[in-house]
C-alpha cells in the first residue's frame, strides 16, 4: 500500500483540484494572456520540476528508458496526432445528436500574436506535465505498485479523465479515449516526447480550428 502513497499525494496536490477558472456548462471563456502566463510560471513549471525531481532522484533518464527528443519519437507522434484528432472529431459530431447532454465550457481562441505565442507555450508545458505524470510516471512505476500493464492503463486513464471532468461529459469521454490511446502508445514505444508533442499540437489545433 505504501507504494501508492507518493502517486496519490502527487495527484491530489497537482491535479485533483476544483478549477477556479472553469465556467458554467456551455459558457464561453475568453483567453487571458496574463492568467495563462501566471499558470505556466506558478503551476506548470513547478509541477513538472517536482515530478521530474522525484523520478530522477531514483533513476537517471537512461535508466528510465527516456532519451532526448529524436527520430524515435516521430512514429509515436505520427500515430498519436491523427488518432487524437479522430477521437475529438467523432465526439464533436456525435455530441450534436445528444443536445440534452450538457456541454462543457467553450474556451475561446487568442486574438493576437503574443497571446497565440503564450498559448503554444502553455499547450507544450501542459502536455509535458500531463504526459510526465499520467503516462511516464504512473506507467513506469506500475511494477512497483504491483499493477499489470492493462490495470496500469486503466488507473492512468481514470485519473486523467477525472481531471477533465470540468469539460463536461463529452470532455470526460474525450479524455478517457485519448488517455487509453496515449498510454498504450507510451507502453509500446517508450516515447515521452512523441506523445507529448502530439498532445500539445492537438490542443493547439483545437484552438486554431475554433478560430476559423
Placement of each model-derived feature along the sequence:
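Alpha-helical transmembrane segments of polytopic integral membrane proteins
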Residues: 18, 48-51, 58, 87, ...
